[in-house]
């Protein structure tokens, strides 16, 4: 079991191990928790793929999980003692997830602002993209397109048993308010709470095995991983890093852009998807067709796996075959993965 988790403070030892045993897997199951920021869930899938190729595993559960709403506050000097003067509470979500490690205190959204200004992607276009993402997510919910990728969870209370089977974030948003929101990261800026991803909780996982193992177990694989790639650059350039990852991936597996039926590019910010769309010349009708993180949220360690799950189901829903998913990563990196549905 390989599971991404970026905000593990307060979760107890080895969150992936806890998840595996809590799900009823055998105590002999090997487990690893990964932290590659926003790319954790995809990196878990990549490592699972490579373990299978190397013959080091027979079956891998790969994915990610994040409960951003439970990220604790920290008292940095509590162990050694606060001697004199004021102390401060440190938000572990900001410190470990939303702030740049190389310019302490600088939020990821300020780099999205820089990217938007550099590429000339204005507020109106970002807002229009966010509204489109929301509309697509709501349409996918209404049509049942998400049903194949969501495992319902039952929560038992003293009064009733609640069945959770629908993302709540799209229902909370008001598309009419999107153009009226104030900039979130910079006075006079263009990035807002609506055209950026929301803070949310979630988990996603994929079951990986070789085709021979699936046949032996009587299982029919949904898709085959055709390749993966990564890109790294300056930490502040993370919003455009998926462009390099996708280009490297397509060259590596000898696919052309036209060979790809659907793309999923994580909407950490609307400008990330728009930058890739412009640089690669992507058809907007083939990009994030069921909406993205602007509408659904971005649980940090989860999203890399979530977009793979969504991509597979979107391809199935439309009767298509090939897809590419990519995600930007705090620190200046990105990963991309190509898959193809099986006959």
Predicted regions and their residues:
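Active-site pocket-lining segment
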Residues: 111-113, 149, 156, 226-295
């Amino acid at each position: 079991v390989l599971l991404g988790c970026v905000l593990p403070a307060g979760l107890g030892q080895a969150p992936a191990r806890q998840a595996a045993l809590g799900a009823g897997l055998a105590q002999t199951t090997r487990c690893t928790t990964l932290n590659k920021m926003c790319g954790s869930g995809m990196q878990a899938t990549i490592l699972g793929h490579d373990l299978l190729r190397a013959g080091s595993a027979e079956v891998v559960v790969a994915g990610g999980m994040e409960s951003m709403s439970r990220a604790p506050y920290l008292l940095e000097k509590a162990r050694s003692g606060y001697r004199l003067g004021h102390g401060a509470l440190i938000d572990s979500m900001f410190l470990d997830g939303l702030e740049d490690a190389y310019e302490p205190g600088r939020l990821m959204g300020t780099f999205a602002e820089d990217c938007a200004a550099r590429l000339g992607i204005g507020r109106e276009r970002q807002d229009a993209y966010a509204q489109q993402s929301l509309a697509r997510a709501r349409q996918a919910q209404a049509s049942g397109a998400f049903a194949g990728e969501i495992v319902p969870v039952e929560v038992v209370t003293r009064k009733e048993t609640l069945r959770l089977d629908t993302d709540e974030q799209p229902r909370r948003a008001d598309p009419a308010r999107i153009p009226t929101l104030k900039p979130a990261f910079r006075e006079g800026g263009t990035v807002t709470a609506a055209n950026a991803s929301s803070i949310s909780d979630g988990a996603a996982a994929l079951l990986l095995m070789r085709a021979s193992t699936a046949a032996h177990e009587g299982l029919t694989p949904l898709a085959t991983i055709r390749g993966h790639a990564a890109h790294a650059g300056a930490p502040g350039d993370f919003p455009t890093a998926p462009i390099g990852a996708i280009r490297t991936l397509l060259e590596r597996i000898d696919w052309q852009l036209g060979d790809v039926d659907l793309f999923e590019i994580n909407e950490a910010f609307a400008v990330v998807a728009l930058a890739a769309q412009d640089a690669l010349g992507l058809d907007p009708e083939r990009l994030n067709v069921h909406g993205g993180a602007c509408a659904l949220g971005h649980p940090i360690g989860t999203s890399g796996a979530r977009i793979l799950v969504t991509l597979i189901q979107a391809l199935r829903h439309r009767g298509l075959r090939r897809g590419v998913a990519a995600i930007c990563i705090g620190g200046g990196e990105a990963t991309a993965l190509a898959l193809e549905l099986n006959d």
